[in-house]
Amino acid sequence: MKKLAFSVLCALALATPAQAGEVFGGLYAHDVDTFLTKSGFEDGVDVQIGYRGERIGRTPLQPYVFGALNTSGETSYAAVGLSAKFGDRIFFRPGLGIAVHNGSAGNFQRTDKIAFGSRVLFEPEVGIGARLSDRATIEASWVHMSHAQLFGRQNPGIDNIGARLSWKL
């Protein structure tokens, strides 16, 4: 799994143009109970730090990589993927990636911890934000992780909701 995650990260880095992208960081409420999940077992705050590359060619797609560390010792993760920014002063940013986590990869239901069913998960996300200056943006975002029942019926998933600040390099 580590080799797969490293290979994907390297491929995204090579696909990124030579121009500088942006760094971002934020704070997220961890394991928010929503209609998409069957969890709500874990708590704490996630500290997220990442990098988003420039657009790929003439597409709106931008590669990203980030890590999220849970302050309560619960599930932390790293993700890579592609996002697209629509709009300028006010924008909408959907993204889709894969994540590797350090939580339980078990296939059985638990009442004390999320059993994700797989070490590698899909990581869709959505952000709505605003440009603060030529270099800075702020956005509210939702990050979901699950395996979409591809690796078994056990798929509680996890939702993290928060805000991040981006700074263009």
PLM regions and their residue ranges:
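Residues that define the transmembrane beta-barrel architecture of outer-membrane proteins
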Residues: 41-47, 74-78, 120-124, 157-161
